[in-house]
């Protein structure tokens, strides 16, 4: 039996203000090519097809078209993730019908009413798979829970569901034919995060117990974006996201998991690396230092910090010239002229309160300025303070020049 495990596409993701659809299109083509070469008997997507509960129309089309293309290669089982909409998955399942090779699982079900599914494997093999979509901590799964579980911990609730699905997998189990698979969108204790996961749903409150996973040939997990084997001795993987969804994932190798298993024998696991779409880069340095990096940047999505001596009004244009093929997510300037040194204790009288100018200098040293040179801003501030103290009207050369221009322009 051959199974291809994919997960956490997050179609519709935007990084800064940049849609990631070109990157998704690239890796989905790669995944489809891998599936054609591998020729699996089943493709399992362990959740978060979409990045939001209400995906846009283009993202809906992108997701359904991609899954339909995979379903032309092998049956596809899609488990609902915490970013997916169970209602949308139910709609998909209704529209596709029971004869479709594309199966959307919106919620956990008891084994006796569809909680364990079977698919043909090689020769006389039968793949038995128990899917467990994401379970929200504040919602009850009616088929598994009642008032006695209201005060149970999240881990206890998940354990109750896993135990029931485990019993369903082994009911009538034939070790010469059946290959057991568990597919879930869950956080298990010991998994390593990327940092881009929805923070609430990867806290200890949402941690489930690894040791209570049903005994299976392979456990396919989604929810954690860093590809990794399951911790401990369980044979299984988090397939992870196919592209780096934010800068916390920029150094991760993205992949899909290919599984080969036979009845009563350990599964063989091989990973296939993906390009990950356009890389994410953080670049910092002087213009000369940034120029030296240009050959390595290519079409990356970049956050750039340029260190300059004086403010540069054309900085964005200069950076675009350095990286013409890159997408600039953000360009910021670290300008020496906008920074002031912080006054120390030796710079002030030992028993005096700091003056307004001293406090403003300290502020500028920490925050800098948006455009003007810091020394010029400080001189203007000092002039204003003196005018207030002497009860004089502030008068600056720039204001006088503007006043003369206005007077000369009047008839």
Regions found by a protein language model. Give the residues of each.
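Binuclear metal-dependent phosphoesterase catalytic core
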Residues: 113-127, 132, 236-301
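Divalent metal-coordination and catalytic microenvironments
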Residues: 8, 28, 43, 48, ...
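Short coil/turn segments at beta-strand junctions that form active-site/ligand-binding loops
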Residues: 1, 39-41, 74, 125, ...
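Active-site glycine- and acidic-residue-rich loops that bind
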Residues: 155-161, 248-250, 309
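His/Asp/Glu-rich metal-coordinating catalytic cores
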Residues: 55, 64, 69, 77-234
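Accessory, non-catalytic peripheral segments of nucleic-acid enzymes
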Residues: 260-411
């Amino acid at each position: 039996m051959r199974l291809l495990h994919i997960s956490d596409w997050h179609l519709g993701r935007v990084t800064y203000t940049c849609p990631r659809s070109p990157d998704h299109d690239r890796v989905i083509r790669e995944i489809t090519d891998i599936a054609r070469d591998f020729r699996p008997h089943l493709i399992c997507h362990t959740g978060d097809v979409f990045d939001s509960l209400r995906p846009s129309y283009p993202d809906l089309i992108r997701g359904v078209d991609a899954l339909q293309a995979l379903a032309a290669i092998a049956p596809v089982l899609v488990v609902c993730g915490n970013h997916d909409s169970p209602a949308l998955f139910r709609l998909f399942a209704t529209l596709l019908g029971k004869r479709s090779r594309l199966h959307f699982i919106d919620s956990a079900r008891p084994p006796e009413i569809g909680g364990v599914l079977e698919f043909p494997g090689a020769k006389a093999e039968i793949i038995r798979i128990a899917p467990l979509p994401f379970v929200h901590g504040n919602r009850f799964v009616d088929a598994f829970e009642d008032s006695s579980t209201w005060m149970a911990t999240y881990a206890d609730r998940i354990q109750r569901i896993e135990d029931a699905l485990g019993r369903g997998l082994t009911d009538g189990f034939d070790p010469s034919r059946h290959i057991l698979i568990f597919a879930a969108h869950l956080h298990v204790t010991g998994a390593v995060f990327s940092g881009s996961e929805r923070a609430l749903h990867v806290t200890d409150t949402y941690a489930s117990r690894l040791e209570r996973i049903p005994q299976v040939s392979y456990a396919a997990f989604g929810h954690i974006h860093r590809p990794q084997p399951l911790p401990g001795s369980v044979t299984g993987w988090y397939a992870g996201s196919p592209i780096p969804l934010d800068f916390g994932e920029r150094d991760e190798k993205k992949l899909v998991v290919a599984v080969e298993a036979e009845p009563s024998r350990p599964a063989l696991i091989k990973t296939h690396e993906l390009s990950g779409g356009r890389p994410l880069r953080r670049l910092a340095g002087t213009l000369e230092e940034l120029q030296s990096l240009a050959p390595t940047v290519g079409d990356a999505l970049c956050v750039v910090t340029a260190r300059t001596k004086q403010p540069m009004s054309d900085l964005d244009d200069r950076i675009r010239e350095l990286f013409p093929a890159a997408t600039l997510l953000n360009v910021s300037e670290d300008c020496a002229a906008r920074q002031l040194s912080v006054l120390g204790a030796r710079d002030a009288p030992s028993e005096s309160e700091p003056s307004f100018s001293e406090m403003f200098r300290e502020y500028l040293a920490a925050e800098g300025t948006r455009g003007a040179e810091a020394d010029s801003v400080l001189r203007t501030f000092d002039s204003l303070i003196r005018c207030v103290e002497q009860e004089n009207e502030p008068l600056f050369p720039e204001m006088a020049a503007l006043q003369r221009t206005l007077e000369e322009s009047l008839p």
